[in-house]
UniProtKB/Swiss-Prot annotation:
Organism field: Xylella fastidiosa (strain Temecula1 / ATCC 700964)
Residue sites binding Mg(2+) 2 per the record: 27, 29, 185, 190
Active-site residue numbers: 185
Protein name per UniProt: Ribonuclease T
SMART domains: EXOIII (SM00479)
Domain annotation Exonuclease: ranges: 24-198
Domain of life according to the entry: Bacteria
Length: 211
């Protein structure tokens, strides 16, 4: 018999919060700006989770360095920005298809946990990350891509609306979060900051509407 003293949650479950989509923050570091020609070099993803009160929080980060796919190019200037050393002995890069499987496996696990139908990419300038992700999926003929092919949540738009800031560093600081410029342009660091920014805005928004 159901305990009548238990108050059911008033917030929608994750499966309904974003119309069946699981938000997953993705950040990529690349060999340039052209996803059809430049190499994918590093990728990090963070599924967004929900606690018992309905508040969103960043889940566990999964990341990997990626071996440049055959036929892709690398602009040396991009390596100056990211600080990636391709032949570093501790880079431990994976071939592109194995890198995708490494990233996508925890995404599918979290989708199943929350009964979501698809993942939706969250990023800062999100279509940049999505285009490189889709290009890698196409190159490798990967068949189990959990992400929506074109829909995204872009924290550039969200931060511009919430704080009047569109640069990630300034948006993060405007949200009251810490930012270390020395750690920027790492896929893991940028993904973590983007995840906290997304959660901060989406958690505050219902309170602003109600108020």
């Amino acid at each position: 018999m159901m305990n009548q003293s238990i108050t059911p949650p008033t917030h929608p479950p994750m499966s309904q919060r974003f119309r069946g989509y699981l938000p997953v923050v993705v950040d990529v570091e690349t060999g340039g700006f052209n996803w059809n020609h430049h190499a994918l070099l590093e990728i990090a993803c963070i599924p967004i989770e929900m606690d018992d009160t309905g508040r969103l929080y960043p889940g566990e980060v999964t990341s990997t360095h990626v071996i440049p796919a055959p036929g892709t190019d690398i602009d040396p200037k991009s390596l100056e920005v990211t600080g990636i050393i391709l032949d570093h002995p501790f880079r431990f890069a994976k071939e592109e298809k194995l890198a995708l499987e490494h990233i996508f496996t925890p995404v599918r696990t979290t989708m199943k946990k929350y009964k979501c139908q698809r993942a939706i990419l969250v990023g800062h300038n999100a279509h940049f990350d999505l285009n490189f992700l889709n290009a890698a999926v196409t190159r490798t003929a990967y068949k189990r891509n959990p992400f929506h092919q074109f829909s995204v949540f872009d924290t550039v738009t969200l931060a511009g609306m919430a704080y009047g800031q569109t640069v990630l560093a300034r948006a993060v600081q405007a949200a009251g979060l810490d930012w270390n410029a020395a750690d920027a342009h790492s896929a893991v660091y940028d993904a973590e900051k983007t995840a906290h920014l997304f959660c901060t805005i989406t958690n505050i928004w219902p309170l602003m509407v109600a108020g």
